[in-house]
Amino acid sequence: MTVTLPKGVFDIFPYLADAKQLWRHTSLWHSVEKAIHTVCMLYGFCEIRTPIFEKSEVFLHVGEESDVVKKEVYSFLDRKGRSMTLRPEGTAAVVRSFLEHGASHRSDNKFYYILPMFRYERQQAGRYRQHHQFGVEAIGVRHPLRDAEVLALLWDFYSRVGLQHMQIQLNFLGGSETRFRYDKVLRAYLKESMGELSALSQQRFSTNVLRILDSKEPEDQEIIRQAPPILDYVSDEDLKYFNEILDALRVLEIPYAINPRLVRGLDYYSDLVFEATTTFQEVSYALGGGGRYDGLISAFGGASLPACGFGVGLERAIQTLLAQKRIEPQFPHKLRLIPMEPDADQFCLEWSQHLRRLGIPTEVDWSHKKVKGALKAASTEQVSFVCLIGERELISQQLVIKNMSLRKEFFGTKEEVEQRLLYEIQNTPL
């Protein structure tokens, strides 16, 4: 019996020819992850890695009425009967780690992560039961320019990887007083259309009415579109804060739109919420989002600290890059040594190790295929440079290097070809 993957998960694999599966190519993930590390370093964020599973109560702080907690988590009992949950989102785990390591004494804390998340959800385009998320969490500072800086980091990531037709959509939910006032207004409005709402929205009416604005059910859309905007109910102080963020985005030339119906799917968000959207082939969809969560850290038993962050689903981002033809697999340059007879094996073993220590990626074809077959395999496997080594090369100590992409050759002693290889690898485009 052939063993296959369970539904909703996938391999990231280095050998993929099927165009529909190309988004799973290892080199694409390396490229995007490299951009993440670079842009986060430029903004002064430090990488954090939390465990794949946590005690289940960690994720209850996401909100007991959120879809993540109610129906999307993978939970299990360990051998001592304790409930554990595979990480469904990053923020709660980062806050737990932040508090457990006593970092709250620092005035400013900036973290980023690239981690797998696990949600048992209905499969849809760009979403999987194991998916990968790039996220940032900035803890300790409440300032509109900090929020703008977080948005700038998100925008710079999208720009660096080459995504096009991007826009930031924003809304401002205000604090608890604003949401209390708006809750009454929204309930009064929705009561008039209660019978027309979807079953899910009717359920949310009694648990978290604000989440109805996040509904994707078709029958809810016109009702949501005509709902009173929460921005009409925020305080003057909140509105000033929001406008300072917008002013900063204009200065930074980051395109944005105010979306008065935007709320986020996790219950801990307050004040600023945002989504990054793209439009491709006349279809608009989100590639990431986040906001402020000033009450979450105190909910964990810590001090009342301000915080802002976002998450980006990498599967959908990479699929969009491919659809927009902004990325393609890259094969790093490497040299393949091909010993043509057993007497060349020892030479290849020793020289390959020396080349690696010089910084030249090198592998040896130990299969002892015939020359034609070995060269065909090297071409098929995207090898950049090839060196055939037989009796003549061992005696003369003159080596020929074939550039497989340019179909050119250069030759010389070991020392001469080593210098030429270093130059070629550094200066030949991938």
From Swiss-Prot:
Molecular function terms, GO-annotated: ATP binding; histidine-tRNA ligase activity
A GO CC annotation given for this chain: cytoplasm
Keywords: Aminoacyl-tRNA synthetase, ATP-binding, Cytoplasm, Ligase, Nucleotide-binding, Protein biosynthesis
Localization of this protein: Cytoplasm
GO biological processes: histidyl-tRNA aminoacylation
Matching PROSITE patterns: AA_TRNA_LIGASE_II
EC number per UniProt: 6.1.1.21
Main location: cytoplasm
Reactions it catalyzes: tRNA(His) + L-histidine + ATP = L-histidyl-tRNA(His) + AMP + diphosphate + H(+)
Top-level lineage group: Bacteria
Listed Pfam families: HGTP_anticodon, tRNA-synt_His
InterPro entries xrefs: aa-tRNA-synth_II, aa-tRNA-synth_II/BPL/LPL, Anticodon-bd, Anticodon-bd_dom_sf, His-tRNA-ligase, HisRS-like_core, HisRS/HisZ
HAMAP family (alphabetical): His_tRNA_synth
Record text on subunit structure and interactions: Homodimer.
NCBIfam families: hisS
Family, similarity comment: Belongs to the class-II aminoacyl-tRNA synthetase family.
PANTHER family documented for this protein: HISTIDINE--TRNA LIGASE, MITOCHONDRIAL-RELATED (PTHR43707:SF1), HISTIDYL-TRNA SYNTHETASE (PTHR43707)
Protein name: Histidine--tRNA ligase
Organism: Chlamydia pneumoniae (Chlamydophila pneumoniae)
Phylogenetic classification of the source organism: Bacteria, Pseudomonadati, Chlamydiota, Chlamydiia, Chlamydiales
